[in-house]
Curated annotation (Swiss-Prot):
Pfam families: Rhabdo_ncap. It is found in: Virion; Host cytoplasm. GO terms for cellular component: helical viral capsid; host cell cytoplasm; ribonucleoprotein complex; viral nucleocapsid. This is Nucleoprotein. It comes from Drosophila melanogaster sigma virus (isolate Drosophila/USA/AP30/2005) (DMelSV). Its main location: virion. The gene is N.
Length: 450
């Protein structure tokens, strides 16, 4: 914590300036594994005499609307995970933790360091019955889908519930026919809020991602949102690569000019010990497994990058960017200018071109394409000499040489594109672009009339 001594000249009083920490620091997965030297922790207190058979009944009655403690439903998912087995064809390790060796039989529970205690409470079913394993995929599927339902925008929840019912309908049995999925999903928040639910769901999703052909693969419909939870900043960068049509992530990062972006790029990229690009790693599940309380890789921890990426995407007409949530940003004037430069550099890259032809005419086709691009850039420049840099450095240098002054033609082009953005939702990047983009070109970046 920063502590600086200052001196008041008139009263000759010395005092200490202390800076409170209003935000918690980010937590890297690698740090957690280094400090704990174990798999993600899972502490469970199972009900007395718990078995898969008894827990099934509790889960069924929970789904039917009975007042069943969510912890008993977690017991069922835990017992069910023991039946999800697969033999490893290669060693499976992550962050130094051995999940299994080649030839071992593993389950989702193999991903966890499990600490079990006994719950003295018993569950007395309202309607005792014997259920077989044929109901499991239907029961577990509904329970896991409650996670995605509760993370879905409320306007989309009804449609999601209908989709869940359609996907799971083939697995319904006589015992499950009285379950009303829409009613259960509406009342499922108590289960999703249980501290062990995300851990169990993450273990199932990571297991099924490793074994996509497993018989329970359809369960991922409800859990896939847990993969890369807390990685939305990385997802933003990857999306920038896509919309700019770059071959690699580094090629996209080269277009980040604003100074406020530097610390965020470092935050996500400088720790080489995290398994960002390792297959079947714990990394994408850092939030679900509780190995990071504040991810360094989220959009919330990298607001300037999130804002820039979706400003660019909105200008280039991406519905995903237009509908992205507008979050707290950094130095907005710098980000707006950065977005404008990237837009002008890429607006003609629509991707449509002649890709096949006879060998003898290919040079002629390339010459025609170059001439067309030249005409388009000249027209876009409002009659000024066409800007034809070939890389990020060249484009930035072009605007540096102009003292970052945009021509009236360029501002008109921006206005035309912005006005063409369709109806937008409140709180989105698209709304912000329509209302504020032009006015946030900083005063130092004067418009030069042609």
């Amino acid at each position: 914590m920063e502590q600086t001594r200052l001196y008041h000249i008139d009263t000759k009083t010395e005092f200490v300036v202390r800076t409170p920490e209003f935000t918690s620091p980010v937590e890297y997965p690698f740090t957690w594994f280094t400090n704990n030297k174990t798999k993600p922790l899972f502490k469970i207190s199972v009900m007395a005499d718990c078995s898969l058979e008894t827990a099934r009944v509790a889960a069924l009655e929970f789904l039917m609307g009975e007042k069943v403690p969510p912890s008993h439903v977690i017991d069922y998912i835990y017992e069910f995970c023991k039946t999800m087995t697969q033999e490893l064809d290669t060693n499976w390790e992550s962050y130094g933790q051995v999940i299994g060796k080649k030839g071992d039989t593993v389950t989702p529970l193999s991903l966890l360091h499990i600490m079990i205690s006994q719950d003295t409470r018993k569950y007395t079913p309202k309607n005792p019955r014997l259920l077989t394993d044929e109901v499991d995929i239907y029961l577990v599927g509904n329970l896991l889908c409650s996670y995605r339902y509760n993370k879905t925008h409320e306007k989309m929840q009804t449609a999601y519930g209908t989709k869940v019912a359609s996907i799971l309908a083939p697995f319904s049995t006589h015992d499950t026919q009285n379950i009303r999925i829409a009613t259960f999903l509406t009342n499922s928040k108590s289960l999703v809020d249980h501290p062990n639910f995300e851990i169990m769901a993450s273990a199932i999703d990571m297991f099924l991602e490793r074994f996509p052909s497993h018989g329970m693969g359809k369960l991922r419909f409800g859990t896939i949102g847990l993969r890369y939870q807390g990685c939305s900043g990385l997802v933003d960068l990857t999306y920038l690569k896509q919309i700019l049509k770059k071959p690699g992530l580094a090629d996209a990062i080269k277009w980040l000019f604003a100074g406020c972006l530097v610390s965020e790029v470092f935050q996500m990229m400088i720790n080489h010990q995290d398994e960002i690009d390792v297959k079947h790693s714990y990394f994408p599940y850092m939030i679900g497994f509780k190995i990071s309380n504040k991810s360094p890789f989220s959009a919330g921890s990298n607001p300037s990058i999130h804002t820039l990426v979706h400003l660019i995407g909105s200008l280039l007409g991406s519905p995903r960017s237009i509908n992205a949530i507008m979050i707290e940003y950094g130095v907005i004037s710098d980000i707006v200018v950065n977005a404008a430069i990237v837009f002008f550099a890429h607006r003609s890259d629509i991707g449509a071109k002649v890709r096949f032809g006879e060998r003898g005419v290919m040079n002629e086709i390339h010459q025609e394409e170059d001439a067309a691009r030249q005409r388009k850039r000249s027209a876009a420049a409002g009659g000024l000499p066409a800007v034809q840099p070939t890389d990020p450095r060249g484009w930035l240098a072009e605007y540096q040489d102009r003292d970052y002054k945009f021509t009236q033609s360029e501002v008109d082009d921006l206005n035309k594109v912005i006005q063409g953005i369709p109806q937008v939702r409140a709180g989105t990047v698209g709304e912000w672009v329509k209302l504020n983009f032009i006015s946030n070109l900083p005063k130092g970046f004067d418009v030069t009339r042609v």
